Regions:
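Phosphate-binding and adjacent anionic-ligand microenvironments
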Residues: 3-188, 195-197
Length: 200
């Protein structure tokens, strides 16, 4: 890794990437969901920083800055190369993943999409988001909410101390709840379908 290398991921993608990047001294930037945001940040930073890899939780991957969108061919090539390298070391790729979990912590992600069809579907989704925004939970599954990130208002808040801060990303209808146990729960309406998505 070089000092000017960077990794870019979306805000709903595993925080394990941030931790690995930090261990290698690489900057890791978080952007809104969608590869257009990754490509835009590459353009903003390319004069001073070198984009290495980026992606989002929906299995999209971008390697290098030549093709600024999801690149399944490059992803398959990288996975094949990783598999071959680990085989030479006498390991399965799965065993390498376990090694990474042991070194950086165990991470598990899950996505739940709720479809709200019909004339009232979109309204129901808007009401759900407004409810979470106006009456955020104090705890989730027994763990205190330590940060509430409202990307529509571009504000973050620690509900326990009252401390507030700005979020330096474009406005987007996304809420994130960061819990004391390290969990992160994100809620956002789908841009293309009558769905609300919850990322755990």
């Amino acid at each position: 890794a070089k000092p000017n290398d960077m990794v870019i991921k979306t805000i709903v993608t595993t925080d394990m990437i941030d931790k690995i990047a930090a261990a290698y001294g690489i900057k890791c930037y978080n952007v809104l969901t969608g590869f257009k945001w990754i490509a835009e940040l590459i353009r903003e930073k390319e004069a001073s920083e070198n984009f290495v890899i980026g992606g989002e939780e929906s299995y999209g991957l971008m390697v290098g800055s030549k093709l600024r969108d999801k690149d399944a061919v490059a992803a398959v090539a990288i996975i094949s190369e990783m598999t071959a390298y680990e085989k030479e070391q006498g390991k399965l790729l799965y065993e390498k993943l376990i090694d990474l979990y042991v070194k950086y912590g165990f991470y598990k992600e899950h996505l739940i999409s709720l479809t709200k069809k019909g004339m009232n579907g979109q309204k129901e989704i808007e009401q759900m988001m407004e409810h979470y925004r106006s009456t955020p939970p104090v705890s989730i599954n027994g763990s205190a909410v330590t940060q509430l990130l409202d990307y529509e208002k571009r504000r973050g808040k620690n509900p326990q101390t009252g401390e507030e801060w700005n979020i330096a990303l474009p406005k987007s209808n996304v809420l994130q709840f960061i819990l004391a146990d390290g969990s992160k729960i994100s809620a956002r309406p789908s841009g293309a379908e009558p769905k609300i998505k919850f990322y755990f």
